[in-house]
Amino acid sequence: MVGSFLLPLTTTLALRALGYAFPVPALGAVASLLFLFNEGNSMWGGNIPSTLAGEFSHSLGFGLAVLFVGLLYRRIESGRGWRSLAAILALAGLSHPVAFINGAAPGLFFLFDRQRFAANLRYLATVYLTAVLLMGFWLLPLVAKLGYATSINWTWNFTSWHELLPRILWPVAPLAALDALWVVVRPSPANRPGRYVLFSIVITAIAFYDATSVGLPEIRFVPFAQFLVILLALDLVARPLVRVPAAALPALALAAATVAWVQSSITYVPSWIKWNYEGFERKDTYPTLQRITEALRGKLQDPRIAYENSPLYERFGSMRVWEGLPRFSGRATLEGLLLQTPVTSPFIYYLQSLISTQGTGVIPGYFYPSVDPKRGTPRLDLFNARDMLAITPGVKKALDEDPRWQRTLDLPPYAIYHRKDLDGHYVRVPHYRPVMVETSRWKRDFHRWFTTDAALEVPIVAADSVPAAERTRFPLTSRSPTELPHVRLDGHCDIEEHLSHLQIEFTTTCPGLPHWIAVSYFPNWQVEGASRVYLASPAFMLVFPDRPHVRLTYRRITVDWLGIGASLVGLALCLTPARRRQVEVGEPAALDRRLNALRPYLVVAAVLVVLLATAGNVARAVLPRPIYMRGWRAFEKQEYARAIPYFEMATRLGGNSYPAAEGTFFRAASLLRMGKPAAALEGYRALTERFPDNVWVVESYYHVGLCLRQLGRLREAKAAFRYVTLSYPENRWAGFATDQLKQLREEARVRRTRG
């Protein structure tokens, strides 16, 4: 809760730095309670409910960003204090990347100052560059390894304006609107702090619309805009307040009214605070929790634990209680420290959906199946998960009826199941030889592999990750991650392994054969006893041992050391005594003159780029659905030629969105109905490749076969229909594919009879 307690203080300091006289900064500390106790959301960040839900790091960064925005306003005028500003911004960024953007973006306001453009530009560059250097030990490795993370840039679907403007902010919203109008209509030096805050709101709104295009969740920017609205309302209140004799008295009355309003708006926060901070031990369910964790106790070396996702676990203190199983039981679960962003998260959430009545498909852009523990079992085997905790009747019934599982603890409504006949190894030789797949989107294709039951025993690697000198190790290749050659690996291999947090060692009787390691791949894993570590599906490691003993060690690599070096440079800059007038106005004069001459062009170009990019992002967010619906209405009227341009436009604008997938599918469907099977074939294939997890995929595979049949490519058509029946046996389109195969066999029989 440090961030929550910090915000009133940083608000006070920020308002003082903005030039507001007493009692406005003190009133700002009280007004910050309007934001902190906002119960309108519990996951956007910054407010107390979000902190209680686990967004404590964002809360800390939020307070530091507020402080930075205020101090920047004061210090940029003198050109001094850049070291402490850089440190504050770096701490905000290390707490949360969105906090860094929230703090840094308002600084663009000072680049509109005609007289001080060059000086302000140099000052901002000095502060921001130093902050980036200070963050280097974390930032450089993050950027370099971002390809091994999972983006959670989901788009928030607002259902009401109350979400953006909850009840607790109603009194400040009209005040902020009036102040915004005032500072725009009456620009003056006295209104400059208000214009700065208003600009900060605008630039934060722009960041909101551009966030998803750079892989950030847009909703994280809303809290900062809400807080800035409070500051803008304070700007209006400050105008008459500082002119009133004994201003402390009306300020005290306003503070009391604010506290009363906050108190009247609070409902669940106090009980949530008590629930969170009394701990697991004070809950009535704690003895049950102890029995479950004792039944699962082991060590890191042991196979993993899986658990059904369910809100019913809230009775223990949190529905995410089992993320603490490594601490409670000593054994690993499917998740690591970071739940949503590691490279394995799309696979974990897919698997969780298979073994949970209420799965949580939080990673955007992926398909999540219905509960099916039978299909989940081979995927649990893949992750070396031997024990599973279940709570809902449907999942328990499925596991009870599955001979591969045995119930080992019955503690209604909880039950623990033990996987029988699992070898329990993290290192294993796969049953089939690995296949090198030609792919430009390995994450998507590896996920397609993971969702295909028939492919799970054949590990795949991305061709572009295999150096030319190593390709002889992968004689089998494929262009599809799901249609793979199955070449069995002969030989019985004995493997002894030892795992620790930063090291994996194993001894094998089968050097030269591929060894599949059920631990997440990351570039920091270095190997001894093999030439290199390969990224293999789903996101595991694969090695070809050169000798019986192999050791993999997680250690720093070059980019990590470069990041540490950058941070040391940043620290040196901050700790080195400043020379007089180091970044003051007028140095260097020649550069300033050139920059000031270029200012109109630079500012106009930057504004145009930002506005065009934002307009494009808004268009991509808003337009695909209505454009698609125009095409759909034409499609319903069988006006296929008129529908196709709308579908194409929805596909181009929509990116990886659902309207784009629908546009792709119905464009192909329109072409097929127009008697153009060749063009339709390419359209259906485009959907399966671009949107491999979409609900239209199975139907598209079926129509691929249909197009091939119409084109007379009967052998390929049979293969396509057969793929549907094997890969999606429970789907209704598998039944239609079976009918097509029967028709093709009958036609072939007739041709043979006539021949």
Q: What residue ranges belong to the model's regions?
A:
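Membrane-embedded transmembrane-helix bundle of lipid-linked glycan/lipid transferases
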Residues: 1-283, 288-301, 387-390, 406-408, ...
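Extracytoplasmic
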Residues: 9, 97, 260-512, 516-520, ...
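Active-site-proximal, structured, solvent-exposed surfaces of multi-pass membrane proteins
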Residues: 466-596
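Short solvent-exposed coil/turn linkers within tandem alpha-helical repeat scaffolds
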Residues: 651-660, 688-697, 725-739
